[in-house]
Amino acid sequence: MAIWLLCNGVLLIVAYFLGSFPTGYLLGKALQGIDIREHGSKSTGATNVLRTLGKGPGLATLGVDICKGAGAVALVRWAYGNPMFLTQAPATTNIGLWLSLVVIMAGLMAILGHSKSVWLNFTGGKSVATGLGVLLVMSWTVGLAALGIFALVVSLSRIVSLSSISAAISLPVLMFVAKEPLAYVLFSITAGVYVVWRHWANIQRLLAGTEPRLGQKKAVSTDAT
């Protein structure tokens, strides 16, 4: 049992380090020699990179950050599909249950890693893009539905943070409608609450009517990824 727990623990540690890869920070240093955390919203996410460095770096950050979340969940599923890995499980282990639990834990670790990166003194982004990557591998139908809600709200409001919050709030309902396992529903609640909490400053600006829209040039802007 100890070896089995250790193997799963390693998967979760790797998931955290995947999530903590500081894409936006590294692009800021490489392209302009700046610390992206000292500009705009002071976030390493794709929205702040877009506003600070431009479309190309912003899209690159978005793509890599999505892959971080997707990679964390894909790694767990790959491990659980490997007979050598499964030989470490005790004979009475419910593999299906363990898989669901470790998948959601790996997803949460990747999300945490993005927003609290060990490489950046536990700072980072808002975890929206990384969370989307997790969803697309965990349940691609829910991931696409959440992306659709994000796209709809951003097209109507031009406010990225409001779109991210709307998508996060919709997750438990989408998981329930898609009849996903209870573990995935619990993940959607936990991840959704965390993403909304990460947007607390944005919520205050939304209530005050000062949250910038896409295309606006603000000295202090918001980041939703």
Swiss-Prot record:
GO terms for biological process: phospholipid biosynthetic process. The keyword Lipoprotein does not apply. Its EC number is 2.3.1.275. GO terms for molecular function: acyl-phosphate glycerol-3-phosphate acyltransferase activity. Keywords: Cell inner membrane, Cell membrane, Lipid biosynthesis, Lipid metabolism, Membrane, Phospholipid biosynthesis, Phospholipid metabolism, Transferase, Transmembrane, Transmembrane helix. The chain crosses the membrane at residues 1-21, 56-76, 95-115, 134-154, 159-178, 182-201. Pathway: Lipid metabolism; phospholipid metabolism. It comes from the Bacteria. It is found in: Cell inner membrane. GO terms for cellular component: plasma membrane. It catalyses: an acyl phosphate + sn-glycerol 3-phosphate = a 1-acyl-sn-glycero-3-phosphate + phosphate. The keyword Cytoplasm does not apply. It is a multi-pass membrane protein. It is an enzyme of class 2 (transferase). Catalyzes the transfer of an acyl group from acyl-phosphate (acyl-PO(4)) to glycerol-3-phosphate (G3P) to form lysophosphatidic acid (LPA). This enzyme utilizes acyl-phosphate as fatty acyl donor, but not acyl-CoA or acyl-ACP. Belongs to the PlsY family. Probably interacts with PlsX. PANTHER family: GLYCEROL-3-PHOSPHATE ACYLTRANSFERASE-RELATED (PTHR30309:SF0), INNER MEMBRANE PROTEIN YGIH (PTHR30309). This is Glycerol-3-phosphate acyltransferase. It comes from Acaryochloris marina (strain MBIC 11017).
